[in-house]
């Protein structure tokens, strides 16, 4: 019965604190992204950001082409046999 009385306190503690303190890396990232070196933002993040950008653009172009293909197919009437 005693363990049930401590449950609300345990639950609130579990959600309000972290076991591992994380270092605030926002100032470091701001320094990288605010640096005036002539690079676009999608390249300043490194290799991962460049790959993610290229993948996103590829999927966008392929998806647009696929949509236009099906719009063209839908716009052409079928011939009666």
Curated annotation (Swiss-Prot):
Membrane topology of the entry: Single-pass membrane protein
Any single Pfam family the record assigns to this protein: COX7a
GO molecular function, one term: oxidoreductase activity
Record-linked Gene3D superfamilies: Cytochrome c oxidase, subunit VIIa
Domain of life: Eukaryota
Phenotypic consequence of gene deletion: Reduced body weight due to diminished lateral muscle mass, leading to reduced swimming capacity. Mitochondria show reduced formation of mitochondrial respiratory supercomplexes with CIV dimers, leading to metabolic alterations and non-pathological muscle performance decline.
Subunit structure: Component of the complex IV (CIV, cytochrome c oxidase). The complex exists as a monomer or a dimer and forms supercomplexes (SCs) in the inner mitochondrial membrane with NADH-ubiquinone oxidoreductase (complex I, CI) and ubiquinol-cytochrome c oxidoreductase (cytochrome b-c1 complex, complex III, CIII), resulting in different assemblies (supercomplex SCI(1)III(2)IV(1) and megacomplex MCI(2)III(2)IV(2)).
Name of protein: Cytochrome c oxidase subunit 7A1, mitochondrial
Organism annotation: Danio rerio (Zebrafish)
Gene name linked to the record: cox7a1
């Amino acid at each position: 019965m005693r363990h049930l009385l401590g449950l609300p306190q345990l639950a609130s503690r579990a959600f309000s604190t972290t076991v591992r303190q994380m270092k605030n890396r926002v100032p470091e990232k701001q320094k990288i992204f605010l640096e005036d070196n002539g690079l676009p933002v999608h390249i300043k993040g490194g290799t991962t950001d460049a790959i993610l950008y290229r993948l996103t653009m590829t999927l966008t172009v392929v998806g647009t082409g696929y949509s236009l293909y099906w719009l063209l197919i839908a716009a052409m009437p079928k011939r009666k046999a």
